[in-house]
Every structure is written in structure tokens, then in C-alpha cells.
Amino acid sequence: MILGNRIPYEYFATSGKGESEAGSKGLKYETGSYDAALTDAGIENCNVIEYTSVIPTSAKLIPKEEGLKRIRWGEVMECIKAQSNGDKGSFISAAVMTTDVYDHKNKYLGGFALEYSGSGTKEEALKSLATSLKGLIERRGYGLIDNKVEIFKDNKTSKGYILHPGKIFVYDSLHVKKEHGSVFAALCWVSHKFPSSKNSKTRKNK
């Protein structure tokens, strides 16, 4: 049997923030505050790998509590993640927001996640994410959005596509009081599907 590329299936949303006085030269966040943020989010014993921003059509959101219970020590945790780091005295924030996409016949195509990393408030993060969504949709040829994107509402493009941003919105922030601080928001996958390849027959060599 020949299998197609695996498709991310069940996932949960989480966020975390952390601070530390420790930090090696060149990696001042990864060795302390980022690890503290992973612990705050409940995924500190995973090997975290980042995806880009596409959510499969069949992906299923599960409660965070259920997702955390299924984690095994040392497993690969694949995430769509936004992260912000800062030093003592700074304010840092991160956010992830999903967007459902429907075609002109109202067929659900799948979704996208948009990431924000910076020092903005929740409202500023939403504004930035709305701008990012507009560009993402236009680059893919789904049409233009004449007015500003409305979060938590349906938005129709010039080609009839329907976008609904904000079904999932995760935001976290931190006023850094120690030497280093990190904050992140993420969608974390805990299972995958393996579809059969359409071209399952192998061609014989001549």
C-alpha cells in the first residue's frame, strides 16, 4: 500500500509565558524563559516543531485538557506558533487566530492560522491579524476584500469566497520583570491521518 502525505487531524489551542534570569550568549531566551513558557503551556516535555499556517479541511479542535492528557514524554509536537521575546522592563505579546474559508458555493475548503508577535494589546493584535488575513487571501487569488476585515464575522471577497476569522483566538502577554521573558500562542497537533495514494500502482522498470 502506498500512502499519501500525512494530514494533521486533532489539535488544541494553548499559550504560555515565562521569565528567567538565565540565558546563554546567543540563546538568552531558549535556555530559560522560553522553556518556562512551554511549561506554563503544558508542553514542556515535547520536541516542538513549527508548521506554517494552513489548517486541513478535516482538522478537528479538541479541548486543551484532552490534548495535554495525550502527550507522551519526548514526542514531536507540531504547532502553528507565534512567539515574542523581550528583556527586563519590556512588554511582549503573541497571538494566533484561525480563519475558516468557504468557496462561492458555500463549500468549506479549510482554514488558515494567522500569527502575531510583538508588543501590542489584544486589540492591536487583532488589527494586525486582520491586515495579515487580507494579504493572505489576495495572494491566493481568492479575491479582494473592499473594506477592512471584520473579526468574528463573515467577510465576502470580490470572487464570492467567505472568510470567518476568529473562531479560535489565543492571545497572551507579559510584562517582563526578570532578565529575559518569552510568550507564545499555539495550535498543537496530537494526531494525523494517512490517506491512501490515488496512484497506488507502481510502474515496472523497462
Each PLM stretch: what is its role?
Residues 1-206:
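Helix-coil modules at protein/domain termini and other flexible surface or pore-lining loops
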